[in-house]
Regions:
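Conserved glycine-rich beta-strand-loop-beta hairpin in the small C-terminal domain of fold type I
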Residues: 168-172, 176, 189-208, 214-233
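Short hydrophobic/aromatic beta-strand micro-patches
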Residues: 128, 231-233, 269-271
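PLP-dependent enzyme catalytic core of the Aspartate aminotransferase-like
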Residues: 103, 242-298
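Substrate-binding/gating loop at the entrance of the active-site cleft, primarily
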Residues: 1-11
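Active-site phosphate-binding strand-loop segment of PLP-dependent enzymes
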Residues: 18-94
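Conserved core segment of the aminotransferase class I/II
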Residues: 98, 102-194
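A short helix->loop->beta-strand "cap" motif at the edges of active sites that frequently abuts
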Residues: 9, 68-72, 104-105
Length: 298
């Protein structure tokens, strides 16, 4: 959204939590698409900050609408295979990760290295563009960028090259090798990152015991999974106030209001949690519950 602001391009957004399931999502998307002015749709799966995951049926709907209305789907897979309720850790074996790429050619998949590999070097990611979309020609691109108007070439050479800083060769080779080793079954990054789910479960238990609630608690008809992020609320306290008050107890977070959410609460992250901090968190949240008990009154 920050890039869109700089470029002067408009956007609209909605909180998908109230429109889950293929039928409800169809109604909402068709309402948003009715004006014919949507060029692309973007989402993260699993979702940041709620950690909800779109189902195969929902992704099929998005893909079919992308083809029907000719918009591009930007599928952010930064947390690739990190829905630990299903074992996606076996390369070239079922179950396969749900993706919109099965249902349309109008897709760009985005894969980051920083989450699945915890890569400590320069930030690097992949854009995986369908062959059909990559080779598609647009007169508008040719006119604006003075090239042949081939979508993939314009995106890489005329756009991404200009608005990103690039990445060192060593980082590119390192990322490529980690991807190769993952496909060969040498690196099991799903098992390596499962620690986030274990941390989330322990952290949630502490927060819930001290009066907090999970803001985004359901994934259609099942309990939301444990992973890198989760959402928290505390009675009637606003998300902004909760973020500030938690800081006074040594807990960092961001308000859901900064993420596009329309609900009150904060996003908690498991990345920096350590075993010796669970008793500390428990002790401090017990004090938090006592100090702000009035917000839990009905």
């Amino acid at each position: 959204k920050s890039q869109l602001k700089v470029l002067g391009i408009g956007w609209k957004e909605f909180d998908i939590y109230h429109h889950r399931g293929a039928a409800a999502l169809r109604l909402k998307l068709e309402e948003e698409l009715a004006g014919g002015d949507v060029a692309a749709v973007i989402y993260s799966n699993p979702n940041n900050p709620a950690w909800i995951c779109l189902t195969e049926e929902e992704l099929q709907l998005i893909g079919e609408l992308a083809t029907e209305h000719d918009f591009i789907v930007l599928e952010d897979l930064a947390y690739f295979c990190m829905d630990y309720r299903t074992d996606y850790g076996k390369p070239f074996s079922e179950p396969y990760l749900p993706t919109v790429a099965r249902y349309t050619d109008n897709y760009i998949l985005m894969l980051s290295s920083s989450k699945i590999f915890s890569y400590a070097g320069q930030r690097i990611a992949l854009m995986c563009i369908s062959d059909d979309l990559y080779s598609r020609r647009y007169d508008a691109l040719s006119e604006r960028y003075g090239d042949a108007g081939v979508f993939g070439v314009s995106l890489v050479a005329s756009i991404s090259y200009m608005i990103t800083s690039g990445c060192t060769s060593s980082t590119q080779y390192g990322y490529a090798e980690m991807l190769n080793l993952s496909c060969d079954g040498v690196i099991d990054f799903v098992a390596d990152t499962r620690i986030y789910a274990e941390r989330a479960a322990k952290m949630k238990e502490i927060f819930l015991r001290h009066g907090f609630h999970i803001v985004y608690d359901l994934d259609v008809d099942r309990k939301v999974g444990d992973g890198f992020f989760f959402s928290l609320g505390f009675g009637k306290m606003s998300g902004d106030d909760l973020m500030v008050n938690l800081m006074r107890y040594g807990v960092s977070s961001i308000s859901l209001s900064t993420t596009g959410s329309f609900r009150q609460g904060i996003r908690a992250c498991t990345s920096r949690m350590r075993d010796e901090l669970y008793p500390v968190l428990d002790e401090r949240m017990a004090e938090f519950e006592k100090d702000f008990a009035k917000y839990l009154e009905k």
